[in-house]
Regions:
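Short, basic/aromatic recognition patches
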Residues: 144-161
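A conserved beta-strand-loop-helix scaffold within acyl/acetyltransferase catalytic domains
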Residues: 156-162, 167-187, 191-195
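Conserved acetyl-CoA-binding loop-helix of GNAT-fold acetyltransferases
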Residues: 190, 194, 200-217, 241-245
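Conserved GNAT acetyl-CoA-binding A-motif
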Residues: 61, 186, 215-233
């Protein structure tokens, strides 16, 4: 199940490293990073290892520097059923901290402020029958141009090539969007944003359901689309509730760990 999503996320992961021919495990696909050429952000941090696991078959994508492959495989074996809990992630940080320093790097371990690692949850569906159609509201509208309605309060990143938004007095107050052309893609990643004064009113759920229903409808514009995914942070409980209320299923989780150079 979700084979197209697995290909989509693996392809995205390959943009951050070099696919390896090494067979770690029949269920683990490896992407290697070069520790001397990590991409550091403006704060001086870079992702040193990340892993993603699909729930239907337990398969994983791992991208890391070669020096960490064996320790991470041992970790996967030890915590196979609990890879995403605070307990297991803290254990991993503590046990790899010294190894990281040998390579001129230091792990970001600010656990008190929850900045030591970043979690992501992927929801999705392949079938429009999974969707809670009863959650749709009459004020959800489909539109393409962000200039068609008043979108005051939304950053440009929340204006997609295709949008389903809640329209109140000619103003969009909640918007579900995708930024990839549905004419050319089998997997569409959608997002949702709602203005603060309009949250907890069911608008987000209505827009997500309407967007996913259309993308999976088989209409000419979206006839290539096979799967819809919805990505959110592991700490964003309200966003996860929106996904579940829409009828989307939790299909995968990812966790990313950061490092910086020792100066």
């Amino acid at each position: 199940m979700f084979e197209e999503t697995k290909k989509f996320l693996y392809k995205s992961a390959c943009e951050q490293g070099k696919p390896s021919n090494r067979l770690l495990d029949k269920n683990i696909r490896l992407i290697e990073r070069d520790k001397d050429n990590l991409e550091y952000n403006s704060d001086g941090y870079a992702y040193i290892f990340e892993y993603l696991q699909f729930f239907d078959d337990g398969s994983m994508i791992l991208w890391t520097i070669p020096e960490f492959i064996e320790p991470l495989l041992n970790y996967f074996e030890l915590f196979r059923k609990d890879l995403f809990s605070d307990k297991s992630c803290k254990w991993l940080l503590e046990n790899l901290k010294n190894d990281t320093e040998k390579y001129g790097l230091t792990l970001h371990t600010d656990h008190e402020n929850r900045k030591d690692y970043q979690g992501t949850v992927f929801f999705g569906t392949e079938n429009e029958n999974d969707l809670n159609i009863s959650k749709k509201q009459n004020n959800t509208v489909k539109f393409y141009s962000a200039d068609k309605f008043d979108m005051t309060g939304f950053d440009n990143i929340w204006r997609g090539v295709l949008n389903f938004g809640t329209l109140i007095d000619n103003q969009i107050v909640s918007n579900c969007l995708n930024t990839t052309n549905p004419l050319d893609n089998k997997v569409i990643d959608i997002g949702i944003c709602t203005l603060d004064d309009y949250k907890q009113k069911g608008y987000a759920v209505s827009n997500v359901v309407s967007m996913a229903e259309y993308l999976l409808s088989g209409a000419e514009e979206v006839k290539k689309v096979k799967e819809v995914i919805y990505t959110t942070g592991s700490g964003n409980i309200n966003s996860q509730k929106t996904a579940k209320s829409s009828g989307l299923r939790e299909i995968a989780k990812e966790v990313d760990f950061c490092c910086r150079r020792i100066l």
